[in-house]
């Protein structure tokens, strides 16, 4: 009997379910793929689905309640807190993510923020608009210290690129261990001490009860006045009011934020007009090849489904 995999279409993410299925289905004749745009569980296929593929933010209580035969959820995202908070997520259902897939685009977005802030690119753009020829020397990245909170696959990709810029790379982890391309790893309990060393403090940890609000006034106070904070992880990891105060009072040099506690960021939020804060609207994980990037992990895990080896799925998220 064929396995049934339901793929939730995501046009708002420029993700075509039809295109995804066209790439993976030829390798899995044992699987029947069905595309749905319904996210309340009322559409066809939910009751019989062995697996559901979709973006974490698409999942809702009704969807999982209707999926009586569900054995596995494959998220097209790294963060899965949108799924984990659902009461209808049954403990026996496997949940997997796209952890590690976003290294190239997340690293590049981090560098965009680091370079734009350290070179004061907003001022350069203002000068261009005003036809003002102003030349101000700025520091190079070479020799600077980047402290990365989190040492997962995306952090490892960033570390490699930082070494290419001749930067010192320090990781902060809840389980310190040697990691390639990091000069050293410090314990999360020593985050304040690590922050004091940073020219750039980059946040790359998932949102969890342990990381909620971990970047607060205390950590920001430990940073050098010349240092920058970059958050490309989850908005809830940082206290936004504390960031605004630290930048406004020039206790840190600035901040680059791609993620926020509320998305979309409300038009009246003070982050929009705080000088020294650079905002990008959740662009870090996006790329024009995102759909294609999801295929290798999806295919490896689909092989486990058809061979009834769900215990061998990769990127399993405990819940």
Stretch-by-stretch model annotation:
Residues 62-69, 86-91, 220-225, 246-250, ...:
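Short, conserved loop/helix-junction motifs that constitute active-site signature segments
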Residues 36-46, 61-62, 183-197:
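Short acidic low-complexity segments
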Residues 164-181:
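NAD(P)-binding Rossmann-fold cofactor-contacting core
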Residues 20, 96-109, 123, 263-319:
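C-terminal helix-to-coil terminal segments
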Residues 50-125:
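Phosphate/diphosphate ligand-binding glycine-rich loop within oxidoreductases
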Residues 124-157, 184-185:
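Glycine-rich NAD(P)-binding loop of Rossmann-like domains
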Residues 176-270:
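Rossmann-like adenosine-cofactor binding region
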């Amino acid at each position: 009997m064929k396995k049934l995999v339901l793929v939730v279409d995501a046009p708002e993410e420029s993700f075509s379910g039809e295109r995804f299925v066209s790439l993976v289905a030829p390798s899995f004749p044992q699987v029947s793929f069905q595309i749905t745009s319904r996210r309340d569980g009322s559409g066809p296929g939910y009751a019989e689905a062995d697996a559901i593929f979709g973006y974490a933010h698409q999942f809702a209580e009704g969807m999982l309640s209707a999926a009586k035969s569900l054995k596995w959820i494959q998220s097209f995202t790294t963060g899965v807190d949108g799924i984990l908070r659902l009461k209808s997520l049954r403990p026996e259902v496997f949940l997997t993510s796209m952890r590690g897939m976003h290294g190239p685009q997340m690293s590049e977005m981090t560098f965009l923020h680091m370079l734009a802030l350290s070179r004061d690119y907003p001022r350069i753009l203002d000068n261009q608009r005003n036809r003002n020829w102003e030349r101000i020397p700025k520091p190079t990245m070479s020799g600077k210290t980047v402290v990365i909170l989190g040492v997962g696959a995306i952090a490892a990709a960033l570390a490699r690129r930082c070494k290419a810029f001749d930067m010192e790379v320090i990781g902060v982890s809840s389980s310190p261990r040697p990691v390639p391309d990091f000069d050293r790893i410090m314990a999360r309990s020593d985050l304040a001490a690590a922050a004091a060393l940073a020219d750039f403090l980059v946040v790359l940890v998932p949102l969890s009860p342990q990381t909620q609000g971990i970047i607060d006034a205390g950590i920001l106070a430990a940073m050098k006045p010349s240092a920058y904070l970059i958050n490309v992880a989850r908005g809830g990891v940082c206290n936004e009011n504390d960031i605004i105060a630290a930048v406004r009072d020039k206790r840190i040099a600035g901040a680059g934020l791609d993620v926020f506690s509320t998305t979309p960021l409300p038009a009246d939020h003070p982050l929009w007009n705080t000088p020294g804060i650079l905002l990008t609207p959740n662009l870090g994980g996006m790329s024009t090849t995102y759909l294609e990037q999801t295929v290798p992990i999806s295919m490896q895990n689909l092989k486990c489904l058809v061979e009834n080896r769900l215990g061998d799925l990769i990127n399993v998220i405990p819940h």
